[in-house]
Regions:
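Conserved beta-loop-beta/alpha segment of the NTase-like Rossmann-fold superfamily
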Residues: 68, 74-138, 160
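Residues at the starts of beta-strands that form the adenosine-phosphate
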Residues: 40-42, 120, 195
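Short beta-strand segments
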Residues: 1-3, 44-45, 96, 123-126, ...
Length: 230
């Protein structure tokens, strides 16, 4: 999934096209999946106005990767629905954020293996910070706690991607009407009534959303290229 606009990044182009170790973030993300499975079918969802940009980029960098290019929708939900229209029955579908380039091939293969025997599997990481349930106050810079509403950190996990599903299940789930409560694919499939499995993700599988995220991703990429291993 690379149909986001990247408005929080404050850059002159969407964050999936920003440079990470000499390559576009999106190229690095796709390359990890190809390393995990060279025969994988890649469906790339992009903002309509950047499809030609991506084609030109791939040509100029000699990035040879058969891709099905799909126009993004008005929300992430609609973008995924557009992509699923190109997916056959009887397949495993990994829906991944194009701006999570630090996922490892080993984790991708593990998720596909787990999804063979369940409706879907979602990688998660435990929350390490103390969590607070807050509400806005009169000041834009200050929030206040909601009385009697406590968050138990031991029960809280952050969901990552790729989230992997049986194609029949996720395609049927995305046939439901859109709801603003759908924040990821797991929330859609859960609403459809399917019980999902969750497994440990990777702490470095960050989603590049802000300038600070890009700084961290560049530091990790540089360390890996110098020989450090995850």
């Amino acid at each position: 999934m690379a149909a986001g606009s990247g408005s929080r990044m404050g850059a002159d182009r969407p964050k999936q096209f920003l440079e990470l170790g000499g390559k576009a973030v999106l190229q690095r993300t796709i390359e990890v999946f190809l390393e995990a499975d060279p025969d994988i079918t890649v469906v790339t969802v992009l903002p309509e106005q950047f499809i030609s940009y991506w084609k030109d980029y791939c040509y100029s960098r000699n990035f040879i990767c058969p891709q099905i290019l799909v126009k993004g929708g008005i929300t992430r939900f609609h973008s995924v629905r557009n992509a699923l229209a190109r997916i056959p029955e009887g397949a495993l579908v990994a829906v991944h954020d194009g701006v999570r380039p630090l996922i490892t091939p080993a984790k991708i293969r593990e998720l596909f293996d787990l999804a063979e025997n369940c409706p879907g599997v979602v990688p998660v990481v435990p929350c390490v910070d103390t969590m607070k349930v807050l509400q806005p106050s009169e000041s834009k810079e200050i929030w206040s706690e909601i009385p009697g509403c406590e968050a138990d950190r031991s029960e809280l996990f952050g969901a990552q991607t790729p989230q992997v599903f049986q194609s029949e299940i996720i395609k049927a789930a995305y046939g439901m009407p859109y709801d603003t409560a759908f924040t990821d694919d797991a929330s859609v499939v859960s609403r459809y009534g399917k019980s999902l499995s969750y497994t440990m993700g990777e702490r470095l599988n960050i989603k590049i959303t802000t300038p600070e995220d890009l700084i961290l991703a560049r530091a990790v990429t540089a360390a890996l290229e110098e020989g450090y291993s995850l």
